[in-house]
UniProtKB/Swiss-Prot annotation:
Residues carrying lipid (Phosphatidylethanolamine amidated glycine): 123
Species, as recorded: Dictyostelium discoideum
Pfam families cross-referenced by the UniProt entry: ATG8 (PF02991)
GO cellular component, one term: autophagosome membrane
Top-level division of the source organism's lineage: Eukaryota
Principal localisation: membrane
Residue positions assigned to the propeptide: 124-126
Name assigned to this protein: Autophagy-related protein 8-like protein DDB_G0290491
Keywords assigned: Lipoprotein, Membrane
A GO molecular-function descriptor: phosphatidylethanolamine binding
GO biological process: autophagosome assembly; autophagosome maturation; cellular response to nitrogen starvation; mitophagy; response to bacterium
Gene3D superfamilies from the UniProt entry: Phosphatidylinositol 3-kinase Catalytic Subunit, Chain A, domain 1
Protein localization: Membrane
Length: 126
């Protein structure tokens, strides 16, 4: 039985999260601090890393490819689509820059929170 992991916000206080994001933004001016967590009812495998430091000029499609590299299931890449949601219910266009998403949706702590989910787009296994 797998243990449920704490969300990043549950794990760290607001003050600690602000401090972490501020240090990141000061050190890496062209990078965005992003927290990626699996949607609660998703059938997509868990991710082996939550914190990402993404280039501000990266588009959402490229960020999805980066997330795929960190899924705990190697078969997932070929069988399922991944959908990213900002603020739990906003699905950004695939060509949108992470910088514009960050500017519009960053949390008060300085991180952009993205959750991912998926669905099987190729039917059942043969």
């Amino acid at each position: 039985m797998a243990l449920l992991s704490k969300s990043f916000k549950q794990e760290y206080s607001l003050e600690k999260r602000k401090l972490i994001s501020s240090k990141i933004r000061n050190r890496y001016k062209d990078r965005l601090p992003i927290i990626v967590e699996r949607a609660a009812n998703s059938d997509v495998p868990d991710i082996n890393k939550k914190k990402f430091l993404a280039p501000s000029n990266m588009v959402i499609t490229n960020f999805i490819m980066e997330i795929r590299k960190h899924l705990d299931d190697s078969d997932h890449n070929e069988q399922k689509a991944i959908f990213l949601f900002v603020n739990k219910n906003n699905l950004p266009p695939s060509s949108q820059l992470l910088s514009s998403i960050y500017d519009a949706h960053k949390d008060e702590d300085g991180f952009l929170y993205i959750c991912y989910s998926g669905e099987n787009t190729f039917g059942s296994d043969i």
